[in-house]
A protein has these predicted regions:
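Active-site neighborhoods and metal-handling regions in enzymes and metal-associated proteins
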Residues: 1-424
Length: 424
């Protein structure tokens, strides 16, 4: 049998699902300039998420990006950004654009001579590592190997800040993801029947998502890096807390997966909260809608209407350029004035203290609509706004993913044509 070929690396119906080379080039150039402004010689990118962001794939390796004023940069006559790959070099070349790539790609040298290799490239100073992303022992190993070059700073915040602003291409990926996500909600709708379990509904949503290219993992920034991307909680299960820092815990199927959907069966006149994430070519969209069998009581409907009002207040605040902490204050104080202080985003003592989280390649990006985030959402920043209420007999709320524009906030996920509550 013939060896594998790059012709086998494609999206559906032969589509090229690689990140455009122009995207990679502009991202690397921006980071190179940011490093120079911060007085950093070069950054070594090793987080899989950021390797995809800058190199177009997450092969096992380390991507060196010199500052624009470093002798190793292309601007100063050096080789520029170089991806040192352990495996697979051939896939790394293809994913970075093959013959059009803006990267140098080579086999990772022995770690014993890595510092010398970088010196020969023109590096003259400490290398900045992603110490806020990589495991401590892994980071220490590289700090020791690169010590001859000098002390290096942590570049985690620089990379995170750059990724807050999404390009037009990234926003298009999210819009495409939202189309698939809508089909996921429709699949859930078709599966809502008396006696079905939460996991039955998850399976219906998963089938749609997988069929459209979901890779199986929702990337998280915060330890323990775990998330269930389809959280469906019915009735009293919606009031069960979990380890996960979000409004809705859920029973999960067993203690090792102790969050999200479980074996709770659907009943009449109970709130069924459906929180679905889809990831399209790496990019997250997040939305929540309510379902029921036979309708909900006026009290539940009033609660949902109130959360829509809270969501609108947060969206308006972010849209006019308020700090995210101000948006939190406005939304949480409104909810408290409605009498929901002990039920907003969970019940005491397990309440979460946020009303929205940025999304992109990861579900939990920054900034967050919470106390302490004293800065606005940037233009082309993307945020999932999700005020929810939790009671002993269930949970209810709304969530959509929004993008900040110069004209204000625009919804990326389900539009007004999709009901906030679907009675099946």
């Amino acid at each position: 049998m013939a060896p594998w070929s790059i012709d086998e690396l494609h999206g559906p119906d032969g589509e090229d699902w690689r990140v455009p080379v122009g995207e990679l080039e502009s991202r690397i150039t921006e980071l190179s300039n940011n490093l120079a402004e911060a007085g950093i010689e070069a950054a070594l990118i090793q987080s899989p998420v950021d390797l995809y962001y800058y190199a177009g794939g997450r092969q096992n390796g380390a991507l060196l990006i010199p500052a624009v004023d470093s002798a190793a940069s292309t601007e100063q006559g050096g080789d520029g950004a170089t991806f040192f790959v352990r495996r697979s070099v051939e896939r790394a070349k293809f994913e970075a654009g093959a013959g059009d790539s803006c990267l140098e790609i080579q086999k990772f040298p022995s770690l014993r001579i890595f510092a010398e290799t970088l010196t020969n490239m023109g590096i003259d100073g400490g290398i900045s590592l992603q110490l806020g992303e990589i495991p401590a022992d892994f980071g220490q190993k590289f700090k020791s190997a690169l010590a001859p070059l000098g002390e290096g700073k942590d570049c985690t915040a620089i990379v995170h800040h750059q990724r807050e602003t999404k390009s037009d291409w990234e926003l298009e990926m999210m819009r495409e993801g939202a189309k698939v996500q809508r089909q996921m909600f429709e699949a859930v709708k078709q599966s809502v029947t008396l006696g079905a379990t939460e996991l039955d509904l998850v399976a219906a949503a998963e089938e749609v998502s997988r069929r459209h290219g979901f890779g199986g993992t929702v990337q998280m920034r915060r330890f323990p890096l775990q998330c269930d991307r389809a959280v469906i909680a019915s009735g009293r299960a919606g009031g069960v807390p979990s380890f996960f820092d979000s409004a809705i815990g859920g029973t999960g199927p067993h203690p090792m997966a102790g969050m999200g959907s479980g074996f709770t069966k659907l009943e009449e006149n109970q709130p069924i909260l459906v929180d679905l994430v889809h990831v399209h070519r790496g990019y997250v969209v997040d939305a929540t809608r309510m379902f029921s069998i036979g309708g909900l009581s006026e009290r539940w409907l009033e609660r949902l209407s109130d959360m829509v009002e809270v969501s609108d207040s947060v969206v308006a605040s972010l849209g006019r350029g308020d700090d995210c902490s101000k948006a939190w204050q406005i939304g949480s104080e409104l909810a408290e004035s409605m009498g929901y202080g002990e039920h907003l985003m969970g019940m005491q003592p397990d309440q979460s203290k946020f009303l929205g989280h940025s999304v992109g390649l990861q579900l939990d990006e920054s900034p967050v609509v919470a106390r302490g985030f004293d800065r606005p959402l940037v233009d082309n920043g993307v945020m999932a706004i999700e005020p929810k209420l939790v009671f002993n007999d269930g949970s209810i709320g709304v969530e959509d993913t929004w993008v900040k524009t110069k004209q204000g906030m625009k919804r990326v996920t389900l539009d007004d044509s999709y009901d906030l509550i679907i009675d099946c």
